[in-house]
């Protein structure tokens, strides 16, 4: 069975059905890549580039397309190597690698369908009978009564863990993010103490500082350390992205200074870029994304890098349904996965693509059992969510404000 074509589909739909996330973000875009064959099977993957800059994806897919025509899926890492090498001057990290990720995922999906096996079986097999899942909740909705309602909503959906952002978000007023060490530490400790009292001692709680892409200001190492130490009594699973990605050495110093586990890595592309962070022990828990890092195989390479340093990984997954399932398969195949990120109460670009293939029971995800990634992209889904140019998310900065 040989590849006959590679094509891109861009879509725009509701970001989520979660009423608490919809206060901050209403629409999302997505980029799906399909690989067609002379045997009739179609491989389907997603690149997280479709969430940020969807208009760029088709041109990059077309750049790589000739390398795949006439090929089989017998050796996916070799096909990936050829494409990566072809883009050597511009693709070693960044956008080219992110789009390549979606192509590689479609290749794995195709191979799984051809062999009748789930993708995690092709990556070495599921290393867990189940994995804990958390609801990724976006901002800390305020006032605190609203935050409590948010937690209760996620627990009602069957989650036992959740993650919220640093600072606060109040509908009609916007974001508040304390920056000075004492102010930030006091604010976050007060908030997490409230969350722990409300959720109970057994709930899995996480915080995302979002400092990897904060366009206005980022915490200094002093502020990040103060916050992390202030959160030590509350037994967080992790504190995510408390520093910018330009400072792996600062991250390493932060890890040494606190018992709060420090997580990060969602903005890193390819094992090549991850290596310095792994070697410096910059994260207690790395967060590769199997729709962004370069591919499911690259995810496995990163996971091994972290395991070799005695560290864990936790999937990052904020793309649509393809992205989510790519990360679930990779998370099960990696032997050092701590927890899976799951978009709660998701809308059509998740539910229709996943099509019942994600099973969560008592707060844990079970290994997917459908051939390939277990995702679909129907003609009805294409019709109902036509692409809207400009619907990709971008960081709001002076002169370029995010609208929805």
Regions found by a protein language model. Name each.
Residues 1-39, 44, 48-49, 347-351, ...:
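Structured beta-strand/loop patches that form or line metal/cofactor-binding pockets in enzymes
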Residues 3, 40, 64, 103, ...:
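Conserved, mostly hydrophobic/aromatic
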Residues 36-115:
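Metal- or metallocofactor-binding catalytic centers and their adjacent structured scaffolds
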Residues 43, 133-135, 160-164, 205-209, ...:
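Hydrophobic faces of well-ordered beta-strands that scaffold small-molecule active sites
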Residues 62, 229, 235, 244-372:
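Shared catalytic-loop signature of beta/alpha-barrel
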Residues 373-404:
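Extended hydrophobic packing segments that form well-structured cores
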């Amino acid at each position: 069975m040989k590849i006959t074509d590679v094509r891109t589909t861009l879509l725009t739909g509701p970001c989520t059905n979660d009423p608490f996330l919809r206060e901050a973000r209403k629409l999302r875009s997505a980029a799906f890549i399909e690989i067609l064959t002379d045997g009739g099977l179609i491989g389907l993957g997603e690149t997280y580039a479709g969430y940020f800059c969807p208009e760029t994806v088709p041109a990059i897919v077309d750049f790589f397309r000739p390398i795949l025509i006439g090929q089989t899926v017998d050796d996916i890492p070799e096909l990936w190597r050829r494409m990566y090498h072809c883009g050597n001057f511009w693709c070693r990290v960044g956008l080219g690698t992110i789009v390549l990720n979606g192509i590689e995922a479609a290749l794995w999906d195709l191979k799984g369908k051809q062999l009748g096996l789930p993708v995690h079986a092709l990556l070495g097999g599921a290393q867990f009978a189940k994995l804990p899942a958390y609801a990724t909740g976006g901002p800390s909705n305020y006032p605190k009564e609203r935050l409590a309602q948010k937690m209760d909503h996620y627990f009602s959906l069957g989650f036992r863990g959740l993650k919220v952002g640093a600072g606060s978000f109040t509908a009609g007023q916007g974001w508040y993010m304390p920056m000075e060490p004492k102010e930030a530490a006091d604010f976050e400790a007060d908030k997490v103490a409230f969350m722990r009292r409300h959720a109970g001692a057994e709930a899995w709680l996480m915080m995302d500082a979002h400092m990897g892409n904060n366009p206005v200001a980022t915490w200094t190492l002093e502020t990040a350390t103060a916050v992390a130490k202030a959160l030590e009594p509350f037994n967080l699973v992790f504190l995510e992205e408390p520093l910018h990605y330009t400072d792996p050495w600062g991250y390493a110093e932060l890890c040494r200074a606190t018992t709060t586990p420090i997580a990060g890595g969602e903005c890193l592309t390819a094992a090549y870029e991850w290596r310095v962070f792994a070697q410096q022990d910059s994260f207690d828990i790395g967060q590769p994304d199997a729709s962004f890092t370069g591919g499911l195989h690259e995810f496995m390479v990163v996971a091994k890098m972290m395991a070799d340093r005695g560290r864990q990984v936790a999937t990052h997954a904020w793309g649509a349904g393809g992205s989510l399932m790519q990360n679930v398969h990779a998370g099960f195949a990696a032997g050092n996965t701590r927890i899976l990120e799951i978009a709660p109460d998701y809308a059509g670009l998740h539910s229709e693509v996943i099509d019942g293939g994600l099973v969560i029971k008592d707060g844990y995800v079970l290994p997917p059992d459908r051939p390939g990634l277990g995702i679909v992209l129907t003609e009805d889904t294409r019709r109902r969510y036509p692409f809207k140019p400009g619907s990709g998310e971008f960081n709001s900065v002076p002169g370029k404000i995010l609208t929805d």
